[in-house]
Amino acid sequence: MAAITQATVEKPIHYPEKLIDTVLTRLPLAEGCHVVDAVYVLYRCLQQTDHHRADIEEYCCELLAMIREHHKPDGGFSYYMGYSQPHYHRVHITYHHPVSDLHGTLLLTWAAAMIRHILGYHDWRIIKP
């Protein structure tokens, strides 16, 4: 996953405005990695520029609605909308059940924390997974 790989590097982002413009062209697929990758790019780019901040905040509100669709009654999140992640790096780990899973919960909680920060709520500490 590109976001986690980049999370370990604390170097300036090249062309943050162009990256923001690219991310804002469409919503990501409603899958854990795609959602967190989009949010992470915006989160990191906003540390260098306020380019399209209002558009980013609106986009993040749409992402929060998408993340809510992954929420399950047990409090966790499913990686896919409606069901758990059956494979991880081509290894079968479970079946398509309508339950939360660890990977989805980690990624979507991290995405929600970054979105809260983007929206001006700094009550959650952003960590690197």
Name each model-derived stretch.
Residues A30-V36:
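Alpha-solenoid helical repeat architecture
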Residues M1:
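Aromatic-lined, polymer-binding surfaces characteristic
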